[in-house]
């Protein structure tokens, strides 16, 4: 489901950042040591409690050695899948096997 408000966006981005950091076996303290980011700021962002700029996300992605788009792909994966399903539904309409049989009769 697409984010309902700005807070939902922050939460999804924060969850993605935390997930990627943990996959890399890094702690918040590790990130702090690798950057100028304060541990408390990282924690707030990962919990969706603080807004971030695109520049901040790009810098953070560089620290994690990932492409910045990975953050957004993770954060909005479910939304992208839902949009794809909606496009398929719009393209194929309400196809049922019965409607195909009706056309062949």
What are these regions (language model features)?
Residues 2, 72-105:
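Short, charged recognition helix plus adjacent turn
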Residues 53-70:
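DNA major-groove recognition helix of helix-turn-helix/homeodomain DNA-binding modules
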Residues 1-23:
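A short, Lys/Arg-rich alpha-helix, primarily the initiator
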Residues 17, 28, 39, 54-57:
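Helix-turn-helix DNA-binding elements, focusing on the entry/boundary residues of the two helices
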Residues 21, 32, 61:
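The alpha-helix within a helix-turn-helix
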Residues 25-44:
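Short alpha-helical DNA-recognition segment
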């Amino acid at each position: 489901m697409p984010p309902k408000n700005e807070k939902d966006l922050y939460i999804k981005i924060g969850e993605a950042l935390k997930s990627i950091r943990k996959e890399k076996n890094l702690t918040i303290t590790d990130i702090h040591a690798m950057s100028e980011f304060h541990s408390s700021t990282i924690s707030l962002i990962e919990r969706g409690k603080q807004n971030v700029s695109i520049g901040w996300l790009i810098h953070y992605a560089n620290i994690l050695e990932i492409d910045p788009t990975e953050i957004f792909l993770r954060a909005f994966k479910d939304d992208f899948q839902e949009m794809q399903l909606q496009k398929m539904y719009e393209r194929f309409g309400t196809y049922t096997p019965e409607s195909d049989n009706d056309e062949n009769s």
